[in-house]
Regions:
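A short helix-coil junction within the Rossmann-fold of NAD(P)-dependent oxidoreductases
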Residues: 1-12
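Residue(s) in the substrate-gating loop at a strand-loop-helix junction
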Residues: 21
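Short, flexible catalytic-loop segment of classical short-chain dehydrogenase/reductase
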Residues: 25, 59, 63-74
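Active-site loop immediately N-terminal to the catalytic Tyr-X3-Lys motif
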Residues: 26-32, 91
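Active-site helix of classical SDR
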Residues: 37
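Alpha-helical segment proximal to the catalytic Tyr-Lys
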Residues: 49-54
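Catalytic Tyr-x(3-8)-Lys segment
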Residues: 78-98
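C-terminal substrate-recognition "lid" of short-chain dehydrogenase/reductases
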Residues: 95-119, 124
Length: 129
């Protein structure tokens, strides 16, 4: 990306979009490694944005909660149902196109930089299910 020609009048050369998870801040019992790895991605966001700013490269992380995905298809129905019960609004898993819509907004909006964007319908995972 550093070698890219600037794409905008501000000199932007691109954006790195990373994916974390609501588990970075709301990890469940048994998710120590998963939560730690997603927390590491979230923690990387601001320092990476600062390091790459001089090159005109942005860094943003999207932290989704429960979304329809290959991973959630593997969840037992009971677990998925209990997670859906703690969704505030909308009361359903996120849709892939909703994730894509946010990713597109990140690409298009140069002021989004160095941020972790929760995409979670106000869901906060309980400490126990």
């Amino acid at each position: 990306m550093v070698k890219n020609e600037p794409l905008t009048e501000d000199g932007e050369r691109g954006v790195i979009i990373m994916v974390s998870s609501s588990a970075a801040t709301d990890g469940q019992p048994g998710q120590v490694a998963y939560s730690a790895s997603k927390g590491a991605v979230a923690s990387l966001t601001l320092p990476l944005a600062r390091d790459l700013a001089r090159h005109g490269i942005r860094a943003v992380t999207i932290a989704p909660a429960l979304f329809d995905s290959a991973m959630t298809k593997l969840m037992p129905k009971k677990v998925k149902a209990s997670l859906e019960r703690v969704m505030e609004f909308p009361v359903r898993p996120g849709k892939p196109e909703e994730f894509a819509s946010l990713a597109l907004q990140v690409v298009e909006n140069s002021m989004l930089n160095g941020s972790v964007l929760r995409l979670d319908g106000a869901m906060r995972m309980p400490s126990r299910m």
